[in-house]
Swiss-Prot record:
Keywords: Cytoplasm, DNA-binding, DNA-directed RNA polymerase, Magnesium, Metal-binding, Nucleotidyltransferase, Transcription, Transferase, Zinc. It is found in: Cytoplasm. Zn(2+) 2 binds at C102, C105, C149, C152. It comes from Methanococcus vannielii (strain ATCC 35089 / DSM 1224 / JCM 13029 / OCM 148 / SB). Part of the RNA polymerase complex. One of its GO terms (biological process) is DNA-templated transcription. The gene is rpo1N. This is DNA-directed RNA polymerase subunit Rpo1N. The lineage of its organism: Archaea, Methanobacteriati, Methanobacteriota, Methanomada group, Methanococci. It catalyses: RNA(n) + a ribonucleoside 5'-triphosphate = RNA(n+1) + diphosphate. Belongs to the RNA polymerase beta' chain family. Zn(2+) 1 binds at C62, C65, C72, H75. CDD domains: RNAP_archeal_A. DNA-dependent RNA polymerase (RNAP) catalyzes the transcription of DNA into RNA using the four ribonucleoside triphosphates as substrates. Forms the clamp head domain. Its EC number is 2.7.7.6.
Length: 889
């Protein structure tokens, strides 16, 4: 084995500061001139584009390593500063050090006893595998309190810090500004043995290195210039900044050598400090940012590293990849949940490498014959050729109309072709933001016409996708291992159960839910029943009719739906349409809300969101856990198709007339609202008369508002109950709400009865004019309508004042949503970064990458949430039902 092949392990990494000597040692050139190129366009020696620093122009050779563009990595230069300058990145640390050390002897201003005590603690921490530097902060705070140095007895002045890089020495009422040279002198006095106490590793850093006397100049390759369309060169922002630094540095040196007045030297020194500050960080607080001639702020060192667009997050943590596509998404209920519809245009562009074997050679010949423009075809043939020195090289040959016939004849075993994406290929499908595991899953390709990706609506919840213009990404795995891994671990059917709470996250939504209700609560003639069976993809026989009426054979939706259920399924549960009666009538429920499934047959009850809906689907949840994910996928595919078809057969529509309620209902609602307003008026009168009893723990005004909010909230709920009472079973708007397909009865209340009280900052509306919310109300009025109570419903329309209050509530909702999204996004980022190396081990403990135990028992109860049942470890009712049903059958 070659000695360089021996695997090496990094022991530890130490960060230090570059000393002036190190900067000069690693430098290949002293930069002395601000000019970059001469009149002929060649880099000037001693300038910022000096060829010793590396080359970016083809044809030029690096004078340091003799490399050309692409081979020369670039080399550092340096600028000798005329005066020392504070490094803005260490300005706060310098302030802490100046407060903690004696300006005369440089020692930390704590007693010998304290010093020994801290050193002992640090040593103990180090032996125990801890971080000794954590004690430094406590020591710095303690040392800053002393006014006399215990070591030399001299007076230690207090230090005042003005951002970004100014320090003052306070002597009573007077204060003296410390120059960066004076700051450096104090830091130079700190002995090495005290550095450890201050949190500085003196082997790799000294405190005075925080004040710069030499500035490293980055290689040319880090800051390449670009040539514009006009032929002019445009220099990088770092080069612009370095030009400013060199110019001011030269002027400062000339003025010092020429004996210029102190005032001029100080001004130039401050200017040099400003340019070096903005070179390191152009967004530092308290400094005006350096700008381009166009007014654009320069992107300097800190801006290139930090934030979303910085080097770490933009280029290292996240990168652009090949073999991916992105387009708008559309729904397609005819696709399986495992499938994704790929536009033919994309399928012809994205390729899969396939090795030619005796088993697939004929198929590949046909693909090559189609060429690269006709789907399914081949874009490239990869041929291996042996070179003279015996090495193998790969040649990638594009298939064109001129060479495809030749390749049809000459293709042989062992070659690799890059063929078009075809039906059945495995791809990864992703929607951003990727907030959980199911934001990227494996689907099987179905090539379709048009230009959008298509997927089944059941997979919308895990992706949080809708079809109002959302875009999604597809990634094509390029190796057999990757494809196998994606299909085994990431296929959609394997993720029906959410790892968050152990319930189905993939399931029926919207039309599927209301369709299932329509299906299981209706009866169908033979032709309709056959259409439903065919639509769901079943080849089974229809069987005997459920009943015959007037010579017509009828098949119940329940028996048709039963054909989608696996044999052996036994279940009892309450449907979403359940009215939550005081005493459940179970099998005798007049709303058909008690669902019984025996041996895979829907005996009683209707199927709605509680049956196979996303998040709450009891049937779906049971099938996944008892029969496996493949059966669950088959059930979901067939049941949703049947549901949609039943909607198409029966018809399902909603309009403004769904909010129509009879005149007696309207009168009942008006009476309730009148009573609520008079109750509010009574509360106001009691408040003004001083007879209102305050609630426990609240003031009189708070109590008044709580009483009013309670009255108005109850009024809206009561009006909703009235509206619901008069909305029939056939009312499609109410049906959608009751079955859990879309919306809630509160939405219907607001449309048909009353919108209710508008809330701003958790209470009634009080902001506006002095003493009143709007000029339409009397000053000091406290009644319901003057503080945001919207009596009208949406169908009737809002009065101008009501509309204004409604807009206030709506505006707060929008702002709140935007703020919450940003906050939760940032919190998730921090959580992910903190927890990224923590995992559950096979012994049940939770450990990080260093093997340190975080939890002795995973989750304290050793329960895998994805194996739990909606948060419960074991659902005993289900276990009993399963056992009883087994012996009943």
């Amino acid at each position: 084995m070659d000695r360089f092949d021996v695997p090496k392990e990094i022991g530890d990494i130490t960060f230090g500061l570059l000393s002036p000597e190190q900067i000069r040692t690693m430098s290949v050139a002293k930069i002395v001139t601000a000019d970059t190129y001469d009149d002929d366009g060649y880099p000037i020696d001693g300038g910022l584009m000096d060829t010793r620093l590396g080359v970016i122009d083809p044809g030029l050779v690096c004078k340091s390593c003799s490399g050309r563009v692409g081979t020369c990595p670039g080399h550092f230069g340096h600028i000798e500063l005329s005066k020392s300058v504070i490094h803005i990145g260490f300005a706060k640390d310098i302030y802490k050090l100046l407060k903690a050390v004696c300006p005369h002897c440089g020692k930390v201003t704590v007693t010998e006893i304290k010093r020994d005590e801290y050193l002992e603690k640090m040593l103990k921490l180090e032996e125990d595998g801890g971080d000794p530097w954590t004690l430094s902060d406590d020591l710095l705070k303690e040392a800053a309190k002393s006014s006399v140095c215990p070591s030399c007895g001299e007076v230690k002045y207090d230090i005042k810090y003005d951002k970004p890089t100014t320090y003052h020495q306070l002597d009573g009422k007077s204060q003296k500004q410390l120059t960066s040279s004076e700051v450096r002198e104090i830091l130079e006095k700190i002995p090495n043995e005290d550095c450890k106490l201050l949190g500085i590793n003196s082997r790799v850093a000294r405190p005075e290195y925080m004040v710069l006397t030499v500035l490293p100049v980055p290689p040319v390759t880090v800051r390449p210039s670009i040539t514009l369309e006009s032929g002019e060169r445009s220099e990088d922002d770092l080069t612009h900044k370095l030009v400013d630094i060199i110019r001011i540095n030269q002027r400062l040196e000339e003025n010092i050598n020429g004996g210029a007045p102190n005032l001029i030297i100080e001004d130039l020194w401050d200017l040099l400090q400003y340019h070096i500050n903005t070179y390191f960080d152009n967004e530092a607080p308290g400094i005006p940012p350096a700008r381009h001639r166009s007014g654009r702020p320069l992107r300097t060192l800190a801006q290139r590293l930090k934030g979303k667009e910085g080097r770490f997050r933009h280029n290292l943590a996240g990168k652009r990849v090949n073999f991916s596509a992105r387009t708008v998404i559309s729904p397609d209920p005819r696709l399986s949940i495992n499938e994704v519809g790929i536009p033919e245009l994309i399928a012809k562009e994205l390729t899969v490498p396939e090795k030619v074997t005796p088993y697939n050679i004929e198929r590949i010949r046909k693909l090559i014959e189609n060429g690269s423009d006709k789907h399914p075809g081949v874009n490239y043939v990869i041929k291996k050729v042996k070179t003279k020195d015996g090495k193998e090289e790969e040649y990638k040959i594009k298939i064109t109309d001129t060479n495809k016939k030749m390749w049809v004849e000459n293709i042989v075993d062992g070659m690799v072709v890059e063929r078009h994406l075809g039906d059945g290929d495995v791809v990864l499908y992703n929607r951003q933001p990727s907030l959980h595991r199911m934001s990227i899953m494996a689907h099987k390709v179905k090539v379709l016409p048009y230009r959008t990706f298509r997927h089944n609506l059941c997979v919308c919840p895990p992706y949080n996708a809708d079809f109002d213009g959302d875009e999604m990404n597809v990634h094509v795995p390029q190796s057999e291992e990757a494809r196998a891994e994606a299909e085994t671990l990431m296929l959609v059917e394997k993720h029906i159960i959410s790892p968050r709470y152990g319930g189905p996250i993939i399931g029926a939504i919207h039309d599927f839910v209301s369709g299932a209700y329509v299906l299981t609560s209706s009866n169908f003639i033979k032709d309709e029943a056959l259409t439903l069976l065919k639509s769901s993809g079943f080849g089974s026989e229809l069987g005997e009719p459920d009943f015959v009426e007037n010579g017509i054979e009828y098949y119940s939706g329940k028996s048709l739906f039963s054909k989608t259920l696996p044999k052996g399924l036994n279940l009892q549960y309450k449907a979403k349409v359940c009215k939550k009666c005081v005493q459940c009538k179970r099998e005798e429920c007049e709303n058909d809300a008690f669902v019984i499934i025996r041996n895979g047959r829907l005996v009683q009850g209707v199927i709605d969101k509680n049956g196979f809906g996303a998040e709450t689907g009891v049937v779906l949840n049971t099938i996944v856990k008892d029969f496996g994910s493949e059966d669950a996928r088959t059930f979901l595919d067939s049941a949703t198709k049947m549901s949609v078809k039943s909607m198409m057969l029966r018809g399902f529509t909603t309009g403004i007339d769904d909010e129509d309620i009879p005149s007696e209902a309207i009168q009942e609602i008006q009476d309730l609202l009148d009573k609520a307003e008079s109750d509010v008026q009574e509360i106001v009168e009691r408040y003004e008369g001083g007879t209102l009893d305050p609630l426990p723990g609240r003031g009189i005004e708070e109590s008044r508002e709580a009483y009013i909010m309670q009255i108005l909230g109850k009024a809206r709920d009561d009006t909703g109950k009235v509206a619901e009472k008069y909305l029939s079973k056939e009312n499609h708007a109410a049906l959608m709400a009751r079955t859990g397909a879309r919306g809630s009865l509160l939405n219907i209340t607001m449309m048909a009865a009353s919108v209710g009280q508008q809330s701003v900052r958790g209470g009634r509306v009080f902001r506006g004019y002095r003493g009143r919310t709007l000029p339409h109300f009397g000053e000091g009025s406290l009644d319901a309508k003057s503080h945001g109570f919207v009596r009208s419903c949406y169908k009737k329309g809002l009065a101008p004042t009501e509309y204004f209050f409604h807009a206030m509530g709506g505006r707060e909702g929008l702002v709140d949503q935007a703020v919450r999204t940003a906050q939760s996004g940032y919190m998730q980022r921090r959580l992910v970064n903190a927890l990224q190396d923590i995992k559950a081990e096979y012994d049940g403990t939770v450990r990080d990458s260093r093997g340190i135990i975080v939890q002795f028992n995973y989750g304290e109860d050793l329960v895998d949430p994805s194996k739990a049942d909606h948060g419960k470890g074991v659902d005993l009712d289900k276990v009993f039902t399963k056992v009883i049903s087994k012996y009943e059958n």
